[in-house]
A protein has these predicted regions:
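Hydrophobic membrane-insertion alpha-helices, especially the h-region
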Residues: 8-21
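An extracytoplasmic/periplasmic, membrane-proximal ligand-sensing/linker region
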Residues: 9-10, 245, 270-327
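N-terminal (or domain-start) structured segment
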Residues: 5, 20-119, 183-197, 201-209, ...
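Paired acidic/hydrophobic, glycine-rich loop segments that form the ligand-binding mouth/hinge
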Residues: 93-100, 160, 209-213, 228-231, ...
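Hinge/capping helix and adjacent helix->loop/strand transition within the periplasmic-binding protein
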Residues: 35, 60-64, 86-95, 108-194, ...
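Beta->alpha turn/N-cap motifs
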Residues: 98-104, 195-196, 212-218, 232-235, ...
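Short helices/loops that flank or line small-molecule/ion binding pockets
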Residues: 81-93, 151-153, 176, 180, ...
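C-terminal lobe and pocket-closing loops
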Residues: 217-284, 313-316
Length: 327
């Protein structure tokens, strides 16, 4: 990860379905990377980072011939913890996986959720990406300095929206911005949304003064001129986008987000290894490499126990950072 401050050390896509149990009985012989009946859950609404990641991964895996007919579904609620609870309840289901990231880590803490990521089977961390600071195209703020100047005058009157619960990336990034600008984080009027899709409607509808979310979520809207990009939160500019890093603009912020995949608890070693092998083959495919480039994602691949250790460390960092910010 590229985070240089405690906040920056924290970086978060899954499908939603309400109805019958998620257990699937896909037919066919399972060979190689084929997992008949595989389902990807997205724990927030359509259009967010988890959703884009899951649907991109499913399409790329199918296009590469790694497996077929992956179902992607959304189960939003409580920052991803509703989906997490459902995943944990599917004990031993080797045909289910959930797209997730730092947002779920934070939501577990902010919602005091009974189920945590320690109750899942870690599969892989896939990507890392910068957050973007955006406003609607008709916003009065043309630069990051203009926005921060108005924000400092009265933080409570300038609501900032994010697609994650407190403790998630879209919450921590503006808190880091506030701290760097001399604004007390506790004075920030942060409005959480259940994913970038919901947040986008509020930015375009002027329900929030500005929004913070992953670059891949709003790339199309930025290029189409629907959103004005003021800055990016990571260590370098994003190729193809005309916006400074926060550090270039004079704010000591270096923050990146991440996303990965977890599975239910209770998988056999063979089931876990098969799902991991599928994701490894996906990661190595030209289809996935092209999708990472198109979405502005950086490779952050990590599997198995190493990913499990990373999740534990992220949880500790979320607790530490929220305490540091007085939140």
């Amino acid at each position: 990860m590229q985070l240089r401050t405690p906040l920056a050390l924290l970086g978060a896509a899954v499908l939603v379905l309400v109805g019958p149990p998620l257990l699937s009985t896909g037919g066919g012989t399972e060979t190689g990377t084929q997992i008949p009946g595989l389902r990807f859950m997205v724990p927030n609404t359509p259009g967010g980072g988890y959703d884009i990641t899951a649907r991109t991964a499913a399409k790329n895996a199918e296009d590469a011939g790694l497996t077929h007919n992956i179902e992607v579904f959304n189960l939003p609620g409580a920052g991803g913890t509703v989906g997490l609870s459902r995943l944990v309840s599917e004990h031993g289901n080797g045909r289910l996986a959930m797209s997730m990231g730092l947002g779920v880590v934070g939501a577990v803490r902010s919602n005091d959720a009974p189920k945590t990521l320690a109750d899942t089977t870690p599969i892989a961390r896939l990507t890392e990406e910068q957050d973007v600071v955006v406003v609607a195209k008709d916003s009065p703020y043309k630069t990051i300095d203009e926005l921060v100047g108005a924000w400092k005058e009265d933080p409570g009157k300038l609501p900032v929206g994010g697609g994650s619960a407190p403790g998630g990336p879209d919450h921590l990034a503006p808190m880091l911005m506030a701290q760097a600008a001399g604004i007390a984080p506790k004075d920030v009027n942060y409005i959480p949304f259940d994913g970038g899709g919901e947040l986008l409607a509020s930015i375009l509808g002027d329900k929030v003064a500005f929004g913070v979310s992953g670059v891949g979520e709003y790339l199309d809207q930025i290029k189409a001129g629907e959103l004005r990009l003021l800055a990016v939160t990571g260590p370098k500019r994003v190729a193809g986008l005309d916006a400074p890093t926060l550090q270039e603009a004079g704010y000591d912020v270096n923050f990146t987000n991440w996303r990965g995949i977890v599975a239910p608890p209770g998988l056999t070693e063979a089931e876990r290894d098969k799902l991991t092998r599928l994701i490894e083959e996906l990661h190595d495919s030209p289809e996935w490499r092209q999708s990472m480039k198109q979405n502005g994602w950086d490779d952050a691949f990590l599997t198995g126990d190493a990913f499990g250790d990373f999740l534990d460390a992220q949880d500790r960092r979320v607790v530490s950072v929220l305490k540091e910010l007085g939140l």
